[in-house]
Structure formats: C-alpha cells, structure tokens
C-alpha cells in the first residue's frame, strides 16, 4: 500500500477504485486489482 499526499490522481487510475474514509484516514481501495491500494493521513 502506498502512502500519498494527494489521492485524486490515484482514483482515476482504474475505474474500480473507490475512495473510503475510515477513522480520519482516506483510503483508495480496489477489489478487482489490489495493487492500486493507497492511503493518506
């Protein structure tokens, strides 16, 4: 999982990427292709 300062560009890398917020941390999750996982914060 990559830690990034900006996730907006990562969300558009794959059409199944979803932006999720858990406990103040923003995550990009992708069920079909897990190598696109990222987090911020």
From Swiss-Prot:
UniProt xrefs under PROSITE patterns: RIBOSOMAL_L36
Keywords, alphabetical: Ribonucleoprotein, Ribosomal protein
InterPro entries named in the record: Ribosomal_bL36, Ribosomal_bL36_sp, Ribosomal_L36_bact
One GO cellular component term: ribosome
One Pfam entry name: Ribosomal_L36
Gene giving rise to this polypeptide: rpmJ
Organism placement in taxonomy: Bacteria, Pseudomonadati, Pseudomonadota, Alphaproteobacteria, Caulobacterales
GO molecular function, one term: structural constituent of ribosome
BP-aspect Gene Ontology terms: translation
Name of the featured protein: Large ribosomal subunit protein bL36
């Amino acid at each position: 999982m990559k830690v990034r300062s900006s996730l907006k560009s990562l969300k558009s890398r794959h059409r199944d990427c979803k932006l999720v917020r858990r406990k103040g941390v923003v995550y990009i999750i992708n069920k079909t292709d897990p190598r696109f996982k990222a987090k911020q914060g």
